[in-house]
UniProtKB/Swiss-Prot annotation:
Name by which UniProt lists this protein: Probable serine carboxypeptidase CPVL
Keywords per UniProt: Carboxypeptidase, Glycoprotein, Hydrolase, Protease, Signal, Zymogen
EC class name: hydrolase
PANTHER family per the UniProt record, alphabetical: SERINE CARBOXYPEPTIDASE CPVL-RELATED, SERINE PROTEASE FAMILY S10 SERINE CARBOXYPEPTIDASE
Gene of this entry: CPVL
A Pfam family of this chain: Peptidase_S10
Residues with glycosylation annotation: N81, N132, N307, N346
Domain of life of the native organism: Eukaryota
Biological process, per Gene Ontology: proteolysis
Protein family membership: Belongs to the peptidase S10 family.
Lineage, opening ranks: Eukaryota, Metazoa, Chordata, Craniata, Vertebrata
EC number of this enzyme: 3.4.16.-
């Protein structure tokens, strides 16, 4: 099936011509009210499901015509809590190649409060927004071989919204509950995909969301009539276990030359105090310390990191500021014709400030028990960009070494292997460490926003993992 076509698919794709807020939210911005024009009305699909008018709802969710939007896709809102009128926005792209068989991949952005429209337009969706607000095709879109489902999560993120403060998530249980409701509805609207392999993926703060929803699916599948065909998860530069990551910051920043000896000692002292609060479950006190070190959200002053490094960007240690083109999508989403095409009307596009407020105490809590359960039962990919600071590869490995799961001993003994895409490549794509169905990947030349920095390597990685193609280089 897919296997027989794989070398052809890879060859075709690879030969295509080449082209402050919250712990991880400085990349995400709110969209001002749209300019004058017809933005249409928001499309709520839950009433169509409940009325048995699924085909009608599906037809209405088809994304309308817009210059550059040349790939079939579907978008709309799914109501996940009627009491508070809480709704999650999704945008779904069936795979360009064999969509009837292709795995369905849920993508969740970090933040907390980062819109998955960032992943769509900046990282691996089919389109890239240009400076003049037009679209061009991405060179290595994940939608080539995978059916990609982008959801603005949690409620209050991006176009997702609620009418009541009680509708905001305060922990990962809330996040998972709402996502699960949305997924069940999604597969009711698109039943032809319910038996396809399903993967949950995401990056950064979604290192919490991904295990949370995967664990809930794992728990409910045995007792629910409607099952989600979960096959595995993939987490990029994931903030799954804050204590392990925070404990390694000072030494890592010193080793890459961003702190001197004196600054390292101060950073280490603050991180130690933060960890002490975490162990005592003083969540807000731990958040305060971390905020002063890295973000400065709670005060009007720059963070300690910003003061001593002179940089606002901790996503790639070769860059001091975020690339300008990572924000083009924000303005694009304010255009009335775009809003009409994706069925959001005049709904506010939120920057996640409120989401972060309600998840503040969640920020420093770990999802390691859930992640361990998933690692014991499913395929798992944990990947890092070599140039990331905030969730550096060394800090992820620090966390993995402290985990106890069925493959932990095999993982600790596993040899790190060089990974190249093609045998003839002079450049090394990255490094692989594998234990059974667990894969750890470090990609060279990439930072926190990995598919943006290294689109081809990210594309090859996700396809090798999901399609089980191994890590040997292709001949050619």
């Amino acid at each position: 099936m897919v296997g027989a076509m794989w070398k052809v698919i890879v060859s075709l794709v690879l030969l295509m011509p080449g082209p402050c807020d919250g712990l991880f939210r400085s990349l995400y911005r709110s969209v001002s009210m749209p300019p004058k024009g017809d933005s249409g009305q928001p499309l709520f699909l839950t009433p169509y499901i409940e009325a048995g008018k699924i085909q009608k709802g599906r037809e209405l969710s088809l994304v309308g015509p817009f210059p550059g939007l040349n790939m079939k896709s579907y978008a709309g809102f799914l109501t996940v809590n009627k009491t508070y009128n809480s709704n999650l926005f999704f945008w779904f792209f069936p795979a360009q190649i064999q969509p009837e068989d292709a795995p369905v991949v849920l993508w969740l952005q970090g933040g907390p409060g980062g819109s998955s429209m960032f992943g769509l337009f900046v990282e691996h969706g089919p389109y890239v927004v240009t400076s003049n607000m037009t679209l061009r095709d991405r060179d290595f879109p994940w939608t080539t071989t995978l059916s990609m489902l982008y959801i603005d999560n949690p409620v209050g993120t991006g176009f997702s919204f609620t009418d009541d403060t009680h509708g905001y998530a305060v922990n990962e249980d809330d996040v998972a509950r709402d996502l699960y409701s949305a997924l069940i509805q999604f597969f009711q609207i698109f039943p032809e995909y319910k038996n396809n392999d399903f993967y949950v993926t995401g990056e950064s703060y979604a290192g919490k969301y991904v295990p949370a929803i995967a664990h809930l699916i794992h728990s409910l599948n045995p007792v629910r009539e409607v099952k989600i065909n979960l096959n595995g998860i993939a987490i990029g530069d994931g903030y799954s276990d804050p204590e392990s990551i925070i404990g390694g910051y000072a030494e890592f920043l010193y080793q890459i030359g961003l702190l001197d000896e004196k600054q390292k000692k101060y950073f280490q002292k603050q991180c130690h105090e933060c960890i002490e609060h975490i162990r005592k479950q003083n969540w807000f006190e731990a958040f305060e310390i971390l905020d002063k070190l890295l973000d400065g959200d709670l005060t009007s002053d720059p963070s300690y990191f910003q003061n001593v490094t002179g940089c606002s960007n901790y996503y790639n240690f070769l860059r001091c500021t975020e690339p300008e083109d990572q924000l083009y999508y924000v303005k694009f989403l304010s255009l009335p014709e775009v809003r009409q095409a994706i069925h959001v009307g005049n709904q506010t596009f939120n920057d996640g400030t409120i989401v972060e407020k309600y998840l503040r105490e969640d920020t420093v809590q770990s999802v390691k028990p859930w992640l361990t359960e998933i690692m014991n039962n499913y395929k798992v990919l944990i990947y890092n960009g070599q140039l990331d600071i905030i969730v550096a590869a060394a800090l992820t490995e620090r966390s993995l070494m402290g985990m106890d799961w069925k493959g932990s001993q095999e993982y600790k003994k596993a040899e790190k292997k060089v990974w190249k895409i093609f045998k003839s490549d002079s450049e090394v794509a990255g490094y692989i460490r594998q234990a059974g169905d667990f894969h750890q990947v470090i990609i060279r030349g990439g930072g926190h926003i990995l598919p943006y920095d290294q689109p081809l390597r990210a594309f090859d990685m996700i396809n090798r993992f999901i399609y089980g193609k191994g890590w040997d280089p292709y001949v050619g």
